[in-house]
A protein has these predicted regions:
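Structural preference for beta-strand elements that scaffold enzyme active sites
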Residues: 12-16, 46-50, 72-74, 117-121, ...
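Canonical radical SAM enzyme core domain
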Residues: 1, 22-86, 90-103, 107, ...
């Protein structure tokens, strides 16, 4: 897979580890990072790494390794404790997911010495509606300077559990407007905070520069701006294609 990744003509290559949670097989993460770095001695690309994890399994040794290899951390934060734990329950019901998240985040930032080493994304379930202000406040409390208010994608497990977590898109738009208004007011009062989707749209509208955001590219950036390599070697044009394959729809699989 790493050899195939370097067949890309792009001068910049970013390898992002997704899941499940890739920290459950951290030895494989290490192998891929080190193999990519070795191949890049000859390929001479601008090489970056990102690992997507809920942080629960990360320990100091892992984080020090990630820092050494400049592998950034992307995680999930859905809001205050009650909302985050509702959206993302752990198998062990006796564990406090949000408390673990906050403790691990502090540990990561302490090792890196930089708050920007870890970024967070939220998922908007029906339990999130009406609570965008609380969610934004929680991001600020935990030291994040931006949020990406995004609707639920109707693919994969989200589609499977739509009766529990889905909502009309009109409800999301209403909440998004309220959330964006709140963020604008925060900035007016001196708290720097960015709504990521609005920033992408405004950059496209007001400047001649591209954003690299595949969903907004025309023609579509799938299979061009990136490719998804699954655990079995299957290659998809986008993450949504991989999610659809979980339910036996292989339309967006490029090959194996």
């Amino acid at each position: 897979i790493v050899k195939t990744i370097f067949m890309s003509p792009s001068p910049c290559i970013k390898i992002e580890f997704q899941g499940g949670d890739p920290s459950t097989d951290f030895e494989m993460v290490k192998y891929i990072i080190e193999e990519a770095e070795w191949q890049n001695l000859f390929k001479k690309r601008e090489l970056e790494f990102v690992i997507c994890t809920n942080l629960t399994l990360l320990n100091e040794k892992m984080v020090k390794y990630l820092k050494k290899h400049n592998c950034m951390i992307s995680t999930s934060l859905d809001g205050p404790k009650d909302l985050h734990d509702t959206n993302r329950p752990l198998q062990n019901k006796n564990l406090d997911h949000h408390a673990i998240f906050e403790k691990k985040l502090q540990m990561i930032r302490g090792i890196w010495g930089d708050d920007e080493c870890a970024s967070a994304l939220m998922t908007t379930s029906k339990y999130s509606l009406g609570r965008f202000k609380d969610i934004i406040d929680e991001y600020i409390r935990l030291g994040f300077h931006n949020i990406f208010l995004r609707a639920l994608n109707p693919y994969g497990f989200a589609k499977q559990h739509k009766d529990k977590i889905a909502y009309p898109i009109e409800d999301f738009v209403k909440n998004y407007k309220e959330g964006l208004d709140y963020i604008i007011e925060l900035n007016k009062k001196g708290t720097f905070f960015v709504e990521g989707y609005a920033a992408l749209l405004l950059r496209r509208i007001l400047t001649p520069f591209a954003t690299g955001f595949v969903d907004l590219q025309s023609p579509a950036g799938v299979g061009i701006a990136g490719a998804i390599y699954d655990y079995d070697g299957s290659v998809y044009v986008a993450d949504e294609g991989r999610m659809m394959a979980r339910f036996k729809n292989y339309y967006f699989r490029l090959g194996n």
